[in-house]
């Protein structure tokens, strides 16, 4: 079929409206012409309801659907394409040189040629030839394979497109669902608001109705009275005047106060937008601030972990300086990403209390940390005083700024970020505490290993056994002996001199390491809390814009130019109150000569603290747990303060360490007169209680003086020493001991002030003294089994020391030891303490005239030694059961009663201390005193002399044991 015939057939199957190929063909029932459905529908609906070809009336439903026409048009298209392709092939498949049909493929040249080129052309001599049809089939096969791959790829892409379309549809549906939810929620919120409005209106309408009824009643009454006045004659008015006055009285019986109602507040809580968080900034001395070019910052406003403050230029900023008041809001701490916040700045009209005259500017801006948004031209400076915004009497301007998150969702996000920051800080604190615990455990294990490796010296007491397993039995038997009135015997644990020195050096090194760790923890904690509180000012700045509003401040927020109000550094104010008397020894700079006294006290207290560390590792672990809980409780407020008596180093530091601690304490330890006054008041109360205790002791001593005088210089075998007191006096002495222990705990409550003498050596000495009572009793039970007798004056003095004003805190003397001891052992120790005090009272608790004659074991670096003569006397009298107090030199006396807390301990001079060390080292025989874990301190009331006649015990009972 030629091209013309194909074209004529194609003309038949062409739409007579658009003259294009038929698409969804329709047939006119009148003229049988074919046309596109879209074309005829558009014609019938927009033009006329008739056929465009035959003009016959035609409706859309009358059209005939010609489904066969589409197949015919496709076949015509194929015929046209084939005819065109064949024609083109005939033109292209000819050789350009010979005009012959291309029939050969040169495999060497990769080119299609004719047979003449292959045979006679001369250009393809020796080449490999293949039939053109074969090569064509190979290429068609390859192309079809690739086409199949592309079709598969196309189908995959189509499926992906369909999946994306489904995803788009799902997203739209989800959005529509959220919109419906929001609409429902908003409708419910609106309904709740309508309910609130209805309730408020019901209340108001009830008030209005009662008032309206009363006004209508009064109006009708007035009209009636006026009518009577106009219409009645004089006689009638006189006769009705009583009735009218009675009506008036009835009206006045109801007071006006009954009509005064409580106004209904016009506020409705929004469930979508949070309320504003506001703060007020009062610019005092405004005229003086105008003369400066520096900005003024308001106190910080903490909102959900964000720190906001107002930045005010009293004389204007930039080009408006001298003309306008510039006010900006700064985000000094918060989330790292940019967030939008709504803010409002209000200047209060001070001439009257009308809030409608306040200048209010509000806007919403995107804030970053350190960025300022506000108003460069907030208000004209020349109109401040004239308009009433500047109080000329006080020279003040009051600004109120408010800020909020746009939605509750953003506010919850800010709070979640703040909680994350706090949890991270808490994790850091816990990690540091665990590190300190590990260090403490390592040091304690190292000390225990060194103690186990060094062999004990059993030269004097080879059968000494003071293991922890036998302490319970010893305490019980010793308490029974004290209750029976028998003599108290105490054995002295003896160790080598080099072992004592090694343990003291290790303990002092441990104190230094622990103190440095605690100090690092304290300082790091303060820095992190300062960062969380947002009190640190940001130094970042952004570009400025001198537009009318929403100007970004450009000036650098330097700390030197900031005029701070109400102490922007919050932690500095907190440290002023409780660091005046809590610094390490030698670091106080508030008093003249305090450093010298504190250094001497540190020397006296070093051995006492070392002995406390050697007592039991569980005690220190428990103390550190207490500190851990205390720091967790104070995490949101003040910094954790470790216990000064144990966790703060009391050993003598090197000069370099002292200088470093002085520099660290200079900026955080100012003097505080209020704290000193409070301290003096508490010390006066403690002195009063001590006077009461002394009075009671004097009464009991007077009642027992008859029994003690009868036994002067007699050491017989009868039991007349304590039986003369009778059962009543014995019970009274026992009750007195319990009362004295109770009063000592009360005195410890008064002394327990964390800001007063935290690091006093007396406190550590009293701790060791109170704990040494149990050690002395344990050693006494051990020595009683061997027939040796020693003095219990050291243990009893430790008990009396705990009742003085230098007693240790209750958390150390009662809480910790009570937790470590079993219940049965605790009850035995209580009876033991009370009986030890009874024996000390019965013996008069004599004192020595000089302070250096008092027993203070553990204060010497090498440990207290017993003199040879005193030990010989002790051995000579031990057979008869005599107990004499041994007083080695180098001990310090107890404080006098009238001395204040700052001058309680007046230690010996350096020369005297040297003499003491010289005299102590002069002995060849190493008579060792109690080791550091059992040392104690003795203190006696002033004015009483020591006398062997007052120390009588029953020798029979002691010898029998």
Swiss-Prot record:
SMART domains in the cross-refs: BBC, BBOX, MATH
GO CC terms, sorted: aggresome; chromosome; cytoplasm; cytosol; ESC/E(Z) complex; perinuclear region of cytoplasm; peroxisomal membrane
Modified residues (N-acetylmethionine): 1
Coiled coil (residue ranges): 132-234, 419-450
UniProt EC number: 2.3.2.27
Modified residues (Phosphoserine): 454
Positions with biased composition (Low complexity): 535-545, 795-806
InterPro entries per the UniProt record, alphabetical: Bbox_C, MATH/TRAF_dom, TRAF-like, TRIM37_MATH, TRIM_RBCC_E3_ubiq-ligases, Znf_B-box, Znf_RING, Znf_RING/FYVE/PHD
Feature: compositional bias, Acidic residues: 548-561, 903-915
Molecular-function annotations in GO: chromatin binding; histone H2AK119 ubiquitin ligase activity; protein homodimerization activity; transcription coactivator activity; tumor necrosis factor receptor binding; ubiquitin protein ligase activity; ubiquitin protein ligase binding; zinc ion binding
Biased composition (Basic and acidic residues): 504-514, 776-787
Localization: Chromosome; Cytoplasm, Perinuclear region; Peroxisome membrane
Chain spans, region Disordered: 447-514, 529-561, 645-665, 776-811, 874-961
RING-type zinc finger segments: 15-55
PROSITE patterns per record: MATH (PS50144), ZF_BBOX (PS50119), ZF_RING_2 (PS50089)
Tissue-specific expression: Highly expressed in testis and brain. In embryonic tissues, expressed in epithelia, including ducts of the developing pancreas, epithelium of the midgut and nasal epithelium. In adult, detected in the central and peripheral nervous systems, including enteric ganglia, retina and the adrenal medulla (at protein level).
Binding-site residues, Zn(2+): 95, 98, 117, 124
Residue intervals of the MATH domain: 276-403
Pathway connected to this protein: Protein modification; protein ubiquitination
Annotated zinc fingers (B box-type), start-end: 90-132
PANTHER family: E3 UBIQUITIN-PROTEIN LIGASE TRIM37
Stated role: E3 ubiquitin-protein ligase required to prevent centriole reduplication. Probably acts by ubiquitinating positive regulators of centriole reduplication. Mediates monoubiquitination of 'Lys-119' of histone H2A (H2AK119Ub), a specific tag for epigenetic transcriptional repression: associates with some Polycomb group (PcG) multiprotein PRC2-like complex and mediates repression of target genes.
Subunit details: Associates with the PRC2/EED-EZH2 complex.
Family assignment from sequence similarity: Belongs to the TRIM/RBCC family.
Protein name: E3 ubiquitin-protein ligase TRIM37
